[in-house]
C-alpha cells in the first residue's frame, strides 16, 4: 500500500531501520565470538528477527492497528460496496488543502485485513465530505476553481480521513519503536 507520510516521520523510520540493522550485525558478531559459525549465527538471527527486529512495515502496522482501535475510528463499519472498492482503486491522491506539509511516499506490504480495515475506516469517515465534494464538482484534475470554490473545497477536504492521514496520525500518536 502506498502512503504519504511526513518527511520527519520518514527520517525517523529510516533511522529506526538503520538501528535495527546495526543491532542485528552486533548480535551476529557476538554470536560468532561466543563460538557459533557464521552460518549458525545467521540462522539464529533469522529466528530472532520477528521478535527482536521486526520489519519496518510490521512496526508501522502495529502503530496503525493501535490508531484504528482508537475510539474516534473504531466502529462497526458497513463493509465497502463493490462500487466503493472500485472507486478506491482509482489512482491519485485524495483532495486536501495545501497545508505546507512536506510528504514522502512510502510503500508497505500490510496484511490484507489491515488494508481493508484502513480503507473502510477512511471511506466511512470521509463519505459525507467526499459526496459533497463530488456533488459540487470541486474535485478532478485540471479544475479551474474560483477563490470561493477553493475555500469550500479546502474546508471539506479538512473533514476527509484518507488512509495516508490515518497512517500519519498513527505514527505521531503511537511512535514506532523496536521491541525492548
Question: Can you name each region flagged by the protein language model?
Answer:
Residues 1-50, 82-150, 154-161:
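Short Lys/Arg-rich basic patches
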Residues 176-180:
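Short, charged, intrinsically disordered terminal tails
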Residues 69-75:
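Arg/Lys-rich amphipathic alpha helix in sigma70-family domain 2
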Amino acid at each position: 500500500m502506498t502512503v504519504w507520510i511526513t518527511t520527519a516521520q520518514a527520517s525517523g523510520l529510516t533511522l529506526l531501520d538503520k538501528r535495527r540493522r546495526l543491532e542485528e550485525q552486533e548480535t551476529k558478531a557476538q554470536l560468532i565470538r561466543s563460538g557459533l559459525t557464521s552460518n549458525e549465527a545467521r540462522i539464529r538471527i533469522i529466528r530472532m528477527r520477528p521478535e527482536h527486529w521486526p520489519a519496518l512495515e510490521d512496526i508501522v502496522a502495529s502503530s496503525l492497528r493501535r490508531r484504528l482501535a482508537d475510539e474516534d475510528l473504531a466502529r462497526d463499519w458497513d463493509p465497502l460496496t463493490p462500487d466503493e472498492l472500485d472507486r478506491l482503486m482509482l489512482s491519485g491522491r485524495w483532495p486536501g488543502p495545501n497545508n505546507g506539509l512536506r510528504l514522502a511516499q512510502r510503500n508497505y506490504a500490510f496484511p490484507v485485513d489491515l488494508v481493508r480495515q484502513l480503507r473502510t475506516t477512511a471511506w466511512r469517515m470521509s463519505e459525507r465530505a467526499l459526496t459533497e465534494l463530488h456533488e459540487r464538482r470541486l474535485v478532478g484534475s485540471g479544475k479551474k476553481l474560483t477563490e470561493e470554490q477553493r475555500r469550500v473545497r479546502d474546508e471539506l477536504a479538512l473533514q476527509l480521513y484518507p488512509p495516508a492521514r490515518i497512517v500519519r496520525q498513527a505514527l505521531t500518536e503511537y511512535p514506532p519503536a523496536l521491541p525492548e
